[in-house]
């Protein structure tokens, strides 16, 4: 049996995230569901697609990685052409490879990079409205960079997740947080070994509050130590977030 690795981009605007919903009678549209239906039709097999991780409803992805097992004898070129012909325009497979039998898109990930985009112009950019959070008030980038330093390293990020399970570890490592600003469009790239539910969006929401002067940069350390979701800020909107890169 072959193990096929695919890399894809998707605009998450119309989807309820990556992962398919298993409720009976559910008509929820997800990226995984769209792909599995095309692959099942192509191979006449019940394909189960393994994704590199979940993305929230409305979140986008570039270079998302998934894999699936198949007995199909189609060439890689035939497979990618078929998939892209039948997928909607907001999902596109960009690369396909034969993977080792043991390759697992989720469990083999060493780190992930997310990018969050903020439109900090007074008036919303029409062409970025689906891909950037419009924050009209001018942000203090220096304060945000100072606050971000407290998030670097290994911490218990319980304050920065919507996850309510008491059995799951909330310990994660943030390797880097980079800020890039150009014409009032701010990009925040966050690399870590893994992320909890809503973690990046809550981190960004908190950093924006620092940038607006609502909280001091050093208060982020207090938020981490509190281990209480209520201490952190509201999560940033989903549409500004994009899963950007994976390291295996």
UniProtKB/Swiss-Prot annotation:
Residues the record lists as binding substrate: 114
Keywords, alphabetical: Isomerase, tRNA processing
Gene Ontology biological process terms from the UniProt entry: tRNA pseudouridine synthesis
Signal sequence, renumbered to the chain: none
Keyword Chaperone: no
Catalytic activity: uridine(38/39/40) in tRNA = pseudouridine(38/39/40) in tRNA
Single GO MF descriptor: tRNA pseudouridine(38-40) synthase activity
Record family assignment: Belongs to the tRNA pseudouridine synthase TruA family.
Function: Formation of pseudouridine at positions 38, 39 and 40 in the anticodon stem and loop of transfer RNAs.
Stored PANTHER family: PSEUDOURIDYLATE SYNTHASE, TRNA PSEUDOURIDINE SYNTHASE A 2
NCBIfam families: hisT_truA
Subunit and partners: Homodimer.
Protein name from the UniProt record: tRNA pseudouridine synthase A 1
Name of the coding gene: truA1
